[in-house]
């Protein structure tokens, strides 16, 4: 039974990821005044399937000097962790209702760093290694602010369980009282998922393709799937934290519709940002975090700690 539940979660995720790549190419196309993929199937709808067949039937080449075990394990680990992070997400019911769901997700996203580091190091290529080191530094740095923002939100929530966030936001979405946190959270999720304008890891001009430069065929596809699964997962988390998950004041019954609409809007914003902004310089990226975001989030965290005490209010109890 649990296996069926697991499959009923994994298969839709992989399908969503496949069509997200198509949506991205279409949006980028129209924003650059051209059409996206439109040959395979009606309006290019079957393009992701063609891409998958092409990638998985190609020969998985491997550099002679690479460390075989790590080279093969890295993409598998990346995808496994990306899918594991979906387990505590309430949509509207989680696969496993964890008591410390948010901590579990933070821990899993920290482990994802190892997949990137292994792939860069095992490739035995200087480009891959530099890309991996950049990715690791960026991910670890932005996790600091993500954790502090989460803490601030949880002070209004009262527990580490994601399901209680939905109860907290029945009357007011948390984006209204804590919009500065929400803005910094969104920018940090962009950096955490290595998306433009923070995609320093795959700076084509200097690093060819970043940490996955030596990968081809199937293993490359696994990294690709992991990246896009993380994007959707982060947007679902943002929806749950700040946008009241599946609550809507006008249509409270339409759980799934509300939830999917909010997540899709956030995902489209990710793609819109990618099409609009140039890449940051690496020192600017670090400056933004350590000198702008970190002091701000710490100050706001102190503010959120003092709020319930001064207002003599308690968060919803579970």
UniProtKB/Swiss-Prot annotation:
UniProt-annotated location(s): Mitochondrion inner membrane
Q: How does it sit in the membrane?
A: Multi-pass membrane protein
For whether the record's keyword set contains NAD, the answer is yes
The transmembrane residues are 2-22, 70-90, 100-120, 147-167, 171-191, 217-237, 254-276, 294-314
Q: What class of enzyme is it?
A: translocase
> What InterPro entries does UniProt report for this protein, alphabetically?
NADH_UbQ_OxRdtase_su1/FPO, NADH_UbQ_OxRdtase_su1_CS
Q: Which GO terms describe its molecular function?
A: NADH dehydrogenase (ubiquinone) activity
Top-level taxon in the UniProt lineage: Eukaryota
Task: Tell me which EC number(s) this protein carries.
Answer: 7.1.1.2
Which controlled-vocabulary keywords does the entry list? Electron transport, Membrane, Mitochondrion, Mitochondrion inner membrane, NAD, Respiratory chain, Translocase, Transmembrane, Transmembrane helix, Transport, Ubiquinone
Q: One GO biological process from the UniProt record? A: aerobic respiration
Q: Main role? A: Core subunit of the mitochondrial membrane respiratory chain NADH dehydrogenase (Complex I) that is believed to belong to the minimal assembly required for catalysis. Complex I functions in the transfer of electrons from NADH to the respiratory chain. The immediate electron acceptor for the enzyme is believed to be ubiquinone.
Tell me which family the UniProt entry assigns to this protein.
Answer: Belongs to the complex I subunit 1 family.
Q: What is this protein called?
A: NADH-ubiquinone oxidoreductase chain 1
Which organism is this entry from?
A: Tadarida insignis (Oriental free-tailed bat)
Q: Which gene encodes it?
A: MT-ND1
